[in-house]
Regions:
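Globin-like tetrapyrrole-binding proteins
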Residues: 141
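PAPS-dependent sulfotransferase catalytic core
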Residues: 199-221
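A short, charged helix-loop
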Residues: 108-121
Length: 221
């Protein structure tokens, strides 16, 4: 809905706009990359559900959600297999409660996980963060972000171009080690450095801010 409104306003002035979509996926801008990297490097065996759930469950109670982020908080509270938890936020049991047909719930869950696991196998096995970026770029980006923007903009006869997703540029970014994308807990490190001569510090160092709005509030208005 927010994208639809922005597109509607933009169309009053222009017919074509540029979008920054792809920046988070290409330069490790999402918070969950930081959290998942830390969890991945932790010596605890995530494939031991009982031990994992006990330890992370206790830790989850002691640390406020806003300090660890929703993704890490989810893993803490669930204590699930690490890979499974990342590629599929809902367990099979949880999906059974979402679908009326149990057969559909089980097969949908298995199919989704297997598909994403196959994508991860094609990624950089020696660079965990790059592998997670690759997964997002292959799934979340085309199936969510780009689809949402395309539908919202075209409903307002507005063309949105995505320069960061030029295939040559995207391929180049995956040759950059994740250590240059995430450095000292700063996301998009090398991207921000390269833009320092063109953008104000207030823009480069602005806290990350999601683009969303309460649907209930929008409907009320």
């Amino acid at each position: 809905m927010p994208t639809w409104y922005v597109s509607k306003i933009a169309r009053k002035k222009v017919k074509v706009v540029l979008s920054g979509d792809g920046g988070d996926e290409l330069f490790a801008g999402y918070n969950h990359y930081t959290y998942l990297k830390k969890l991945h490097s932790f010596p605890l065996n995530f494939n031991s559900p009982q031990l994992s759930k006990f330890i992370w469950g206790s830790l989850h109670k002691a640390i406020p959600n806003n300090m660890v982020g929703k993704n890490a908080s989810y893993l803490f509270s669930k204590g699930r297999n690490f890979l499974s938890a990342f590629v599929n936020m809902y367990s099979i049991d949880e999906r059974k409660n979402m679908f009326q047909n149990e057969h559909i719930a089980i097969n949908y869950s298995k199919g989704s996980e297997l598909y994403k696991v196959e994508i991860l196998k094609k990624g950089n096995k020696n660079d965990f963060v790059s592998n997670m970026q690759f997964l997002d770029l292959q799934t979340y980006m085309p199936d969510d972000i780009l689809t949402k923007v395309d539908r919202a903009s075209m409903m307002n006869s507005l063309e949105v171009r995505v320069p960061l997703l030029d295939h040559k540029f995207a391929e180049l970014t995956f040759k950059i080690p994740s250590g240059l994308k995430m450095k000292e807990n700063q996301s998009k490190y090398i991207f921000k450095k390269s833009m320092s001569g063109y953008l104000l510090e207030s823009i480069l160092n602005h806290p990350k801010q999601g683009f969303f709005y309460s649907s209930f509030t929008l409907v009320q208005r």
